[in-house]
Amino acid sequence: MSEMKFYKFNSFNSLVNLSNSILKRFNVKPDHETIKQVDDLLRFSNKVVLLLFDGMGKSQIDKHLNENSFLSHMPKIEIDSVFPPTTVAATNALLAAKFPIETGWLGWCSYFKEKDTILDMFSGKESYGDQVYAGLPQEKVGYKNIIERIKEANPEMYCDSFWPSFSFHNGCSNLDNFISSISNALYDKQECFIYGYWDNPDHLTHDNGVNSILVKDSINNIDKSLEKLCSENKDTLFIVIADHSLIDVKYIVLDQYPEFIDLLKRPFSLEPRCASFFIKEGKDVEFKATFNRLFGEHFLLLSKEEALSRKIFGEGNKHPFVEETLGDYIAISIDEYTFLYHYNEEDTLLVAHHAGGTKEETQLYMYLIKFAR
């Protein structure tokens, strides 16, 4: 049953294929198949803006976008994220134009053999401790992104990116500042490529759940901002996407199952809904039986070999870090249940999450907006 519920993303119609279309348009050899509908539009576009709104996947838009909204009247294509559908894997897949198997960016936290610890990939901080190894993830799995590759192939062309305030490079204090900064950058350009990333509605959905009025307001505010940006820049092709969607979750606290914890070398890594487990020597058979008895109704369990042979992390050459960081087994949520290793009463649990194997988390809308040729 869990096998049937696992949604495998389409590796010919995904975020990676989108970024390869963009590479192709700007004379960079693509690494993977492109998307024909995007290729056809890009052919007539000298100014291209790729905007990613974190967590604004298909299920979120279907639930919250007002009927009379700007985006509801814009042309769109359904595409998939990657697996796992989570920010670390998906945004890096988009920016690298390669699948997670190729980039090594598989999830929020990964095991690093040389430090024998699990680190958060964006910060380098220990996931289950206080030590910080800043720069180590980038050192292991750094890559040249599509902005840099396009600039190399088109040295005279304007290429840039815009971010929330956490970024030292073009960090923007709020949504209005983000939108106006991009509009200002477009003002006098004849040819350009701009990437913009915004971190909502993801944060709001994590904290408040998919049915929250705050999430609805966020998505409709983004919609109004996009209408302003696109109408002020009619000669620009705007490609609007998300990295994933979210679902409300229920938690399974693993350290409440000592017979299961005793089989593990260390806490799980990657993601609570796509968990990587390292197993103690000789405990393989016992682990599989115990896992399936306790959690098999809610999770699909794959061995490392099965996960790789089935190409759940996408097509292409395996990054060396993947072999090191993947545990013996991968457990993929196929419903609302989510792992938590340990729970303290003072912990604030996220209401909604992503990175699992459901269609809701994976499917996206890609909007293609241009008012003039």
Predicted regions and their residues:
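Feature captures the catalytic ectodomains and active-site-proximal regions of enzymes
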Residues: 1-373
